[in-house]
Curated annotation (Swiss-Prot):
Keywords from the UniProt entry: Electron transport, Heme, Iron, Metal-binding, Photosynthesis, Pyrrolidone carboxylic acid, Transport
Family membership noted in the UniProt record: Belongs to the cytochrome c family.
Post-translational modification: Binds 1 heme c group covalently per subunit.
Pfam family, one: Cytochrom_C
GO molecular function, one term: metal ion binding
Keyword Ligase on entry: no
Name of the protein described by the UniProt record: Cytochrome c2
Domain of life: Bacteria
One annotated GO biological process: photosynthesis
Species the sequence originates in: Rhodopseudomonas palustris
Positions of heme c binding: 13, 16-17, 93
Amino acid sequence: QDAAKGEAVFKQCMTCHRADKNMVGPALGGVVGRKAGTAAGFTYSPLNHNSGEAGLVWTQENIIAYLPDPNAYLKKFLTDKGQADKATGSTKMTFKLANDQQRKDVAAYLATLK
């Protein structure tokens, strides 16, 4: 995992995200270690909020697994927690990052943001 390369890949994410302020997507400073759906001042989709309520905390590993298909990841998380009834709707995040190495690099970069 290479945070410097991840910073370059993150430029694609800046259409919707910044480290220090909410935009279309939530601020990502401090995302690693934060409960899903809890960035201050951001209104999340029920799917994302429910995932946080069910115990999803963002780790580098979770971010790597989330990025290829955010909706599928959150729905599987809730279903695995026995909360399939709350695994409805969709997240606001439509971008998907398919490349495995880029996902690892972005997760490493996000871990540096405070």
